[in-house]
């Protein structure tokens, strides 16, 4: 373990906190600093040129990462009739109505994503205090309240990530795992940044994508030279 610690410490020492690195070098540094025995997530933080205190500048949405997230996702769906059958066929792990709501109320939250057909919101709406704080409440802005529950299930299973700007104007998201090839991580990052640009508020002025930094679950952040992202 001492050797690993020395290696990681040496890699961390290479990182200049104020320097902007080419994306390939940044990913190399991040992977080099990943010290955990598990396959750490590779995360990104994007500083946006918005005023997060203004309601018309809240950036929120979702995007399907082309290379996936490397994570197995369990999906629960509130639907009935044909939509319930379509959700099951698309790979949903749990499908129900009142019975699913009772499971949620009982604390059985064995899922990562909740999707709801619009006609079920009378039931789902009563679960806000349970699902909301956990980031599981379905919302049309991120595609989890939709008539096409089957497609929403497919998106979730394929590697869809949701994003929402925090109070500091920063978006945090996972773009893959340490085991991913750099090309996969770069394609996922490009897809995320493209989605953020499309979600840019009309009232946002000046530079929109101000800073981009990548890190591993247990590692330090490495700033990215955005000019190298299009390469």
Curated annotation (Swiss-Prot):
One of its GO terms (cellular component) is cytosolic large ribosomal subunit. Pfam families: Ribosomal_L1. GO terms for molecular function: rRNA binding; structural constituent of ribosome; tRNA binding. SUPFAM superfamilies: Ribosomal protein L1 (SSF56808). InterPro entries: Ribosom_uL1_bac-type, Ribosomal_uL1, Ribosomal_uL1-like, Ribosomal_uL1/biogenesis, Ribosomal_uL1_3-a/b-sand, Ribosomal_uL1_CS. GO terms for biological process: regulation of translation; translation. It comes from the Bacteria. Belongs to the universal ribosomal protein uL1 family. Binds directly to 23S rRNA. The L1 stalk is quite mobile in the ribosome, and is involved in E site tRNA release. Protein L1 is also a translational repressor protein, it controls the translation of the L11 operon by binding to its mRNA. Part of the 50S ribosomal subunit. PANTHER family: 54S RIBOSOMAL PROTEIN L1, MITOCHONDRIAL (PTHR36427), LARGE RIBOSOMAL SUBUNIT PROTEIN UL1M (PTHR36427:SF3). This is Large ribosomal subunit protein uL1. It comes from Cupriavidus taiwanensis (strain DSM 17343 / BCRC 17206 / CCUG 44338 / CIP 107171 / LMG 19424 / R1).
